Amino acid sequence: MPIRVYSTLTRQKEEFQTVEPGKVSMYLCGPTVYKPAHIGHMVGPVIFDTIKRYLAYSGYQVTWVVNITDVDDKLIVKANELGTTVEALARKMTEDYLDNLRTLGVDGIDHMPYATQYIQEMQEIIAGLIEKGYAYPLNGDVYFECTKDADYGKLSGRNLTEMLAGTRAETRDGKHNPADFALWKGSKPGEPAWDSPWGPGRPGWHIECSAMARKLLGDTIDIHGGGLDLMFPHHENELAQSESCTGKPFARYWLHNGLLRKSSGGKIGGDHSRHGDSADMMAEKHAQEEQKLAGSKGAESVKTAVFTKFDPEIVRFFLMATHYRSPVDFGDDRLAETEKSIDGFYRLIESFGRATGKDFYSLPVPATRSESEKSWTATASANASYEAELAALRTRFLDAMDDDFNTGAATAALFDLRKTLNSFITEEKLEGDGRSNATAQAALVRGVMLFKELANILGVLRKPLEKKSAGGADDEFVNSLMQLLISLRAEARKAKQFEIADKVRKGLTELKVTLEDRPEGTIWRREA
């Protein structure tokens, strides 16, 4: 089936067709870098990194741009508070942002432009808008005149006439209409400033993205993404000024991800088919913003609030378990549920290693869908039922991703694929007598390669899971204690003191530690 995407602009799913066949241009609004990145800053990049992965897997050549806003009122205020320069603060916070993206496996960004590097391009657009009558200078500032754009409000569904109802035609600051927004801001003493035809100043927020997207991706881009909270006014204003400048559609598809909100519980790894597809997108936006995770918890550095307690792999799995347009219930309880849910994936990887002697993480897998299709043509097999189940789960996963990048449903398919592989290992006794069964071994490798291929699309299972120690306990010390207990239990069993051995196992179980006896020895793991 063809890829279909839900565009906020049309409020419906559409067949994905790009401006240039075989190529995708994608722009995601990045952060204003005035403080350390929090978990909310990570949602969009992880989602759109996954979208790029799937589009590339589907055969597209994708160019993905994520901007950095390195000049803004917030940056100026924060730099003054800290007694540093805007440039130094922006550099430091940008590196923090990039470090967090790398930690989460977001490695597909092709261009990360800084707003201050595109001042000339911004001024060219502003001059063009003035010339066409869409903008006007005012006391060193330049404003976009919203009433001159007959389509203003089409993205958010807001009616400009209703927005202006009850307001005076001219506002006290001289703007023609209250809705008019700044394209250029005259500078104040001590603020960053660039020369312009309208006097020294700096760009408005919205013009930055229009200029960078146009310069790097062209007049019309395929996908414009961002959080639902950016739909209005930021994306609405981007669209208005860009289309007024070029006379062309700014973006073919507008994709908005849901916002983080305080955890309210729920199942991890389900379909999560309910998501933000309301015809009234502004109502959806306001509903999510009312529950948006903010304040001390939401704004806390992601390194402090999350990565000290949970492996980043868990965070990425967690975000994949929900459709990107859905609001995301976030909290330590949800991450703990995710950790517990995905533990089985890593146990499967361990079982695979014991059964085949192969390293899961170095398995070669197809990079594209067309390459993968070649290995899934119908063939006679001694394990026909198993092979058919693998093929069906592969189709289910890909159908989910074709349906507006539904990672929630795709993740559910991955869980079921894990069950199928575990059952095959058990039925064929591949960790025991069945190790000599070359046909079954090959079938398992084939299935696990599919498992890895699909996991790669989601950007998960990149490395072994790192368990975070509760209360900062020393992992090496804890492991040494566990090995001592395992040794004492083994001696008790050897001496036929089974009551003592069982007491050790039971006590550890109560502490949420599981012992697993294997031919090569006993291993332990801490349950989430």
What are these regions (language model features)?
Residues 266-268, 275-285, 289-528:
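Structural preference for alpha-helix termini/caps and helix-kink/transition segments
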Residues 10-15, 19-107, 517, 521-524:
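N-terminal, positively charged nucleic-acid-binding surface of large information/translation enzymes
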Residues 79-86, 110-116, 199, 227-228:
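The substrate-binding groove and active-site-proximal loops of carbohydrate-active enzymes
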Residues 1-34, 49, 63, 99, ...:
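Alpha-helical recognition segments enriched in aromatics with Gly/Pro capping
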Residues 68-72, 93-97, 107-122, 140-149:
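Short, glycine/charge-rich beta-strand/loop segments that flank catalytic centers
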